[in-house]
Amino acid sequence: MSEQHSPIISVQDVSKKLGDHILLSKVSFSVYPGEVFGIVGHSGSGKTTLLRCLDFLDMPTSGSISVAGFDNSLPTQKFSRRNFSKKVAYISQNYGLFSSKTVFENIAYPLRIHHSEMSKSEVEEQVYDTLNFLNLYHRHDAYPGNLSGGQKQKVAIARAIVCQPEVVLCDEITSALDPKSTENIIERLLQLNQERGITLVLVSHEIDVVKKICSHVLVMHQGAVEELGTTEELFLNSENSITNELFHEDINIAALSSCYFAEDREEVLRLNFSKELAIQGIISKVIQTGLVSINILSGNINLFRKSPMGFLIIVLEGEVEQRKKAKELLIELGVVIKEFY
């Protein structure tokens, strides 16, 4: 983000305890307007607790939180949930829809609560505009019980954005969806971010979702910040074991470790590559030098915010000096090398 912007979310030294149990420990980070910010980590790492603190549903034991101009230093009696909800919306994995209300009525509800000054026609116009944006107009008179999981989540998103918030907090909103519905939700969230400038904070255990949508990622472990950076930086360059475990969970290290490799002449490498390198013949360029032989064990290409990035697991075979020269060539080509053995 541009340096001239102030953070729309600022978290400084936030800790939270429940009895003797530490839920969050000195968490600090900033989110800037227009970012799609991911929060990842294993179960129990503090992701949802942190998100609830950002929504002021939970309060930290210590530290400061500022979100869209509201902060936790305000006395409880002076904090206006109504005013806060005009600027910040929260979407959970459980949809939270009123079963007795139609799709239209569910989406109109926050407008009637937070914008009572709006006329009936103004409410209808804003609701139908939101329905059209999410391709839900044809279901406006349906009840939640008659909707698919993906449609319910779209309604939850519509209800969250109908008041035109500055920030939307998303808690595991694709966890119960099938792959096609997940892709659809990702596209809509990206569209929200790019066309309406809404800042998104996304908690997810689905790392593929994070790769596809997030510009920046906070990695949490046991309630603390393990690592923070752009999605590309963490995928390509991280040396952190927790980050690599999350970002490269599709690499079966145990299976690779069980393979036999001849001493001195073979080594296993992970090659990380980004953008234009994903479609170039980087392996063939190395093989053509005649320095080494290369066997490909595994590989994958993912879209990171519509830019291809991926990895290859290879066995590099040759004499020590030849392997060294081959690795130097790979680095010159822009490949990031991680050694297994």
Curated annotation (Swiss-Prot):
One of its GO terms (molecular function) is ABC-type D-methionine transporter activity. Keywords: Amino-acid transport, ATP-binding, Cell inner membrane, Cell membrane, Membrane, Nucleotide-binding, Translocase, Transport. It is found in: Cell inner membrane. It catalyses: L-methionine(out) + ATP + H2O = L-methionine(in) + ADP + phosphate + H(+); D-methionine(out) + ATP + H2O = D-methionine(in) + ADP + phosphate + H(+). It comes from the Bacteria. It is a peripheral membrane protein. The keyword ATP-binding applies. Pfam families: ABC_tran (PF00005), NIL (PF09383). Residues 9-247 form the ABC transporter domain. ATP binds at G41, H42, S43, G44, S45, G46, K47, T48. GO terms for cellular component: plasma membrane. Its EC number is 7.4.2.11. The complex is composed of two ATP-binding proteins (MetN), two transmembrane proteins (MetI) and a solute-binding protein (MetQ). Part of the ABC transporter complex MetNIQ involved in methionine import. Responsible for energy coupling to the transport system. Belongs to the ABC transporter superfamily. Methionine importer (TC 3.A.1.24) family. This is Methionine import ATP-binding protein MetN. It comes from Chlamydia pneumoniae.
